[in-house]
């Protein structure tokens, strides 16, 4: 099941996602994928609708480290700190227990070895940091499995 969220009237986005993500037992996961950002002026409404409607226990923050501006606009990218803080702050409106469970980096266009950057980010946030297209996901999966 799914919802083509871009085709849903804004007033009903959260409800459409909530309908797909009812409270489940601890052995069931709903994976909600969104490509927007709470900070992108063109997509923030959709991102917030997904966040509120899905009421996640955890989220994986996705980032492309060589990008300085958001795609299609001149808006600068916010820091990872601010992205994590705002996703948690706004997510707490529908799930007070939300937290960041990891960081996924798209390192495909990096000209340097991404290992150092991933290690630095992981140490700074005390979270797993991986490129999901290149790295083992065991650490992030383990973090998700340990959600109470």
What is each PLM-predicted segment?
Residues 1-148:
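Flexible phosphate-sensing "switch/lid" loops adjacent to ATP/NTP-binding sites
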């Amino acid at each position: 099941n799914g919802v083509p969220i871009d085709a849903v009237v804004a007033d009903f986005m959260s409800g459409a996602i909530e309908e797909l993500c009812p409270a489940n037992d601890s052995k069931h996961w709903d994976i909600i994928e969104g490509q927007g950002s709470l900070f992108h002026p063109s997509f923030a409404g959709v991102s917030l609708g997904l966040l509120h409607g899905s009421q996640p226990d955890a989220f994986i923050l996705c980032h492309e480290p060589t990008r300085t501006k958001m795609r299609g606009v001149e808006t600068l990218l916010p820091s990872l700190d601010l992205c994590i803080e705002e996703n948690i702050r706004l997510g707490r409106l529908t799930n007070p227990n939300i937290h960041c469970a990891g960081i996924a980096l798209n390192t495909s266009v990096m000209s340097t070895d991404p290992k150092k950057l991933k290690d630095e980010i992981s140490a700074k946030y005390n979270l797993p940091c991986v490129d999901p297209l290149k790295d083992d996901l065991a650490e992030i999966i383990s973090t998700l499995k340990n959600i109470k």
